[in-house]
Amino acid sequence: MIKRIALIAAVLFPLSGFAAGGGPQGAYWEQPNVNLGNEASLQRGAQLFVNYCMACHTAKYHRWMHVSDDLDIPADVVEENLIWTTDESGKKHQVGTLMTNSMTTEYGEDAFGKAPPDLTLTARERGPGWIYNYLRTFYVEESSTTGVNNAVLAGASMPHVMWELQGFQRPVYSEDEHGDKHIESFELVQQGSMSPDEFDRAMNDLVNFMVYLGEPAR
């Protein structure tokens, strides 16, 4: 019962102090700690995935019931707190349904220039390190249509959806022997709700969950 109450609280309330192509790995590049045996991390990652990814992205090759079974989240908790989509009649989807959203392909193309991709297999296609550093390296660029750019994927059409958590940062450049500039690190210009270490841990949880999506038979 205590475990169940703690889990419901984690799903109900926001975490406190709580994607194609790529650039070269810079000095800022770090590898996440992927651990599919860390159930608490996977549960936190599922919450982040729902709250910050699923408005635009799907994981349509994965079913909610697998999330419930594999991550030890009761089906009623999943249905009440993680599933927000409905069928054509307006009835809320249940735990047996696929992890879809309500965004149409046409709307995605109009809003972002191309429809946001499904994320079920992204960790297998790109690798955990790519996703982790992509999520951490959005930086302010006023000339961009989204107001930001990304060190891993220059010209990314995705806005900085994690800005409330991370805040906004600017790149710090170093110069090589040929005079070419490279991003060395980042400095915060606006603090988010999390400290840098807290944000890194949260993104590690999210990456952990995305690795699970592509490798459910663990």
Question: What are the residue ranges of the model-derived segments?
Answer:
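N-terminal signal peptide c-region/cleavage motif recognized by signal peptidases
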Residues: 14-16
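Bacterial N-terminal signal peptides that target proteins for export
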Residues: 1-7
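Stable alpha-helical elements in mature extracytoplasmic
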Residues: 41, 48-49, 115, 127-131, ...
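The canonical Cys-X-X-Cys-His
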Residues: 49-60, 206
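Juxtamembrane amphipathic/hinge helix adjacent to a transmembrane helix
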Residues: 196-218
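Electrostatic cytochrome c docking/interface patches
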Residues: 21-47, 58-69, 214-218
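Electron-transfer interface patches adjacent to heme c in soluble/periplasmic c-type cytochromes
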Residues: 73-151, 156-177, 184-199
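Short glycine/proline-rich turn/loop motifs
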Residues: 26-29, 182-191, 210-212
